[in-house]
């Protein structure tokens, strides 16, 4: 069976890899307008942490745990995990108000409250939580998945996808998987999905070894001496150009968290549009091609907010199960 995947960000490429790894005889072609290094995921720092998703949705917990287990196994079994920007990272959550443990703390399972002595290092904070999480840098782990996808026989066709039917009829695909992120607003006419603009700054600061977040600001070191400063969470803002006021706000906010940022060189200022939605859409939909009359199934997998690198493998496994169920039913 030949399956089409629309979108080549972290969700699209991980879905494609999982299908090729788990379903013998399946062929996969990805159709996408952008490939790495030009996807939204390439901008992401890649810290494992649920963000801009409905944590009350029971599926989120399952997807988080599945992805965290995948990343732990990736580190344990891949000697080159640092090359692909994947490693453990100590994370400090700081606040002026008491902190409560969240789904993130439950998943990583190693969080502890900072004591009075430790908090003296952060004079603008009264409370803190320390945890060990995992980072999987978008610009490094995406090439890993692309390489693996091609090694498994996958194909990528770069094109602007205007509708599902045009993709389906290319090879009369019985299944089309929609991982188009924000593109689903037009592809599905889904007005529940909207942009959440995120602006970040990359600086050279190899002395920063831990991640910090306080209110809307965060500091996330990468594996090559680069540190990501953020951020913005601007709903329904389609501007993909850096904003000088946002840059100033990010720098000023991060300076209140950690001393010594004043002299760091700014390497780049980047903007990405996260696919915001009240809940992730992961479900199947039966369709009939308007032009050919052929029936096919769309599996939707989009609306991951700021948690693409936190949910991707759990969602990929669920998509894989839906595909497996369809294949099994077709044999009956």
Swiss-Prot record:
Annotated compartments: Peroxisome matrix
Top-rank taxon: Eukaryota
Residues annotated to bind FAD: 8-10, 39-40, 45-47, 161, 180, 274, 305-306, 308, 310
GO process terms (BP): D-amino acid catabolic process; oocyte development; regulation of gonad development
Residues that bind D-serine: 218, 274, 306
GO CC terms in record: peroxisomal matrix
Positions with a binding annotation for D-proline: 218, 274, 306
Short motif Microbody targeting signal, span: 330-332
Catalysed reaction, written as an equation: a D-alpha-amino acid + O2 + H2O = a 2-oxocarboxylate + H2O2 + NH4(+); D-alanine + O2 + H2O = pyruvate + H2O2 + NH4(+); D-arginine + O2 + H2O = 5-guanidino-2-oxopentanoate + H2O2 + NH4(+); D-asparagine + O2 + H2O = 2-oxosuccinamate + H2O2 + NH4(+)
Keywords of this entry: Developmental protein, FAD, Flavoprotein, Oxidoreductase, Peroxisome
Listed EC numbers: 1.4.3.3
Cited InterPro entries: D-amino_acid_oxidase_CS, DAO, FAD-dep_OxRdtase
The protein's name in its UniProt record: D-amino acid oxidase
């Amino acid at each position: 069976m030949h399956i089409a995947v629309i979108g080549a960000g972290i969700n699209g490429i991980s879905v494609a890899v999982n299908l090729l790894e788990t379903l013998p005889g399946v062929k996969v072609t990805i159709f996408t307008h952008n490939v790495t290094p030009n996807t939204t995921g390439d901008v992401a720092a890649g810290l494992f942490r649920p963000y801009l998703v409905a944590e009350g949705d029971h599926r989120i917990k399952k997807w988080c745990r599945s992805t965290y287990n995948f990343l732990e196994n990736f580190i344990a079994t891949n000697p080159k995990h640092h090359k692909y920007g994947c490693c453990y990272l100590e994370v400090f959550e700081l606040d002026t108000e008491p902190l409560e443990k969240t789904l993130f703390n439950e998943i990583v399972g190693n969080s502890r409250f900072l004591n009075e002595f430790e908090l003296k290092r952060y004079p603008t904070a009264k409370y803190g939580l320390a945890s060990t999480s995992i980072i999987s840098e978008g610009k490094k782990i995406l090439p890993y998945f692309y390489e693996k996808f091609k090694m498994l026989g996958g194909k990528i066709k770069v094109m602007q996808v205007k509708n599902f039917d045009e993709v389906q009829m290319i090879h009369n695909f019985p299944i089309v998987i929609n991982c188009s992120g924000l593109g689903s607003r037009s592809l599905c006419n889904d007005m529940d999905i909207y942009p959440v603009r995120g602006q970040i700054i990359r600086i050279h600061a190899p002395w920063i070894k831990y991640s910090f977040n306080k209110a809307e600001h965060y500091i996330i070191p990468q594996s090559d001496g680069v540190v990501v400063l953020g951020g913005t969470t601007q709903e329904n803002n389609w501007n993909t150009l850096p904003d000088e006021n946002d840059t100033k706000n990010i720098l000023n906010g991060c300076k209140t968290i950690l001393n010594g940022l004043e002299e760091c060189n700014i390497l780049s200022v980047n903007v990405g549009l996260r696919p915001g939605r009240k809940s992730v859409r992961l479900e199947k939909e039966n369709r009939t091609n308007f032009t050919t009359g052929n029936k096919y199934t769309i599996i939707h997998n989009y609306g991951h907010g700021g948690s693409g690198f936190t949910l991707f493998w759990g969602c990929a496994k669920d998509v894989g199960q839906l595909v497996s169920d369809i294949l099994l039913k077709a044999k009956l």
